[in-house]
Amino acid sequence: MRALFSVSDKTGVVEFASQLVELGWEIIATGGTMKLLQDAGLKVINISEITGFPEICDGRVKTLHPKVHGGLLGRRDLESHIAQLKENGIEFIDMVCVNLYPFKQTIANPDVTMEDAIENIDIGGPSMLRSAAKNWSAVTVVCNPENYAKIISEIRETGNTTKETRLQLSAEAYTHTAEYDMMIATYMRKAAGLNEKLFLEYDLKQSLRYGENPHQSAKFYATLDTVPYSLATAEQLTGKELSYNNIQDANAALNIAREFDAPFCVGLKHMNPCGAAIGTDVVDAWKKAYEADKVSIFGGIVAVNREINKEVAELMKPIFLEIIMAPSFTDEALEVLRTKKNLRLLKVDMSKEQGGHNMYVSMNGGILVQEQDIETKTVTADMCVTEVKPCECQLTDLDFAWRIVKHVKSNAIVVVKDGATLGVGAGQMNRVGSAKIALEQAEAALKEVGKDIKAEGLVLGSDGFFPFDDTVTLAAEYGVKAIVQPGGSMRDADSVNKANECGITMLCTGMRHFKH
């Protein structure tokens, strides 16, 4: 049995080749791989001894030869193939261990030149992988060091890899070369100024019971790159499988949680926050978020950016929740929450750098692509456009409102007091309609605890500008004292004048946050 080695990623290759030699395999290798194995004391056949031809063109041509590809592609079950190979002095090759030049890593360098990129386009490697993968019934093709141990184990047990394993490895090899070619094609088309083509690469993570509704099928695919605050990398500690709607809502909750450094909690339903708050600690944040809307949070999803301890777990336990997400749970908290068998507990890494990614929306005949709305401006006093200026406590609430309203379906209005939402108006076709919903919710919440809304000096946030002054007029009727909005309307002056007339401070951020 003969194995051909030509690897860029040297991880575990010496041990793998050594074990094959112990099992009676001959090792053939190219250039740097051959030197590495020989330095480790292994007997290695130079590929040039097989081809009878030296490496040429600075190593660009090494394995592109009939004695390599004939040995890989020749069928062991066809006498005509066997005869042709024998006639031409070609021996079978039973395994190929190849991974490709690091093209992805090369072009990730912002200073990469075209020459650097070109020299890291592998030609012989993909050719060998494809030839070996085509003849998978007889040839083992290895492109991932993670498979080395499994291959050695099977050879020890049966003398060769199983047919099932070879088929799986063949599929992996074709996937590897397809991904490689997609990267090269994307780079070269951009360099040539050609029309962009979009290649998407995701792995199936989970087949879901159904989609948004029971009559819709659904699957969850995950990106190959690690994404911070990601459901794809979350560890589920308890509970039944996540549903399509669970994943949508949980992702929305995590995107809100990433906005805050202070202890924060959000309850969410149908991708809109129903209660959100910052607090002195996780218990305080939970209490404020829960009190914000005790009705809507029923059956909702909760995300917390601090460890869940026993105290907050006991407060959450009586409430029917679908999911609780946090960076960690104490053992005592897990003991409390595990008694609710259907409650899903997700441990999510929230410590990584907050990066953005592209968002895709499917439609008939195509998809829309946009960058994630990751940037949020910190609300500062110099954004004020009215005669009345904000105090420090108002600035804190204005910034909180601005970070929350960004994640509410447009038209979006939130009403805030002391670092907590009191009302959320989402998805209405006119802005004043959303404002009315949010203000009525806030009034009801305050009335429940014996407070008058007009005496509280509330803060209002809007994801879009005010086309008319009607939203400011309505806000003033409910006692709102500070407003944050993007600005940019042709009638901004009307809203500013109305705010001045009503003694309201208004800040314009210059950044809109529509969410459809």
Residue map of PLM features:
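Mobile "lid/hinge" segments at catalytic clefts and subdomain interfaces of large enzymes
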Residues: 128, 135-148
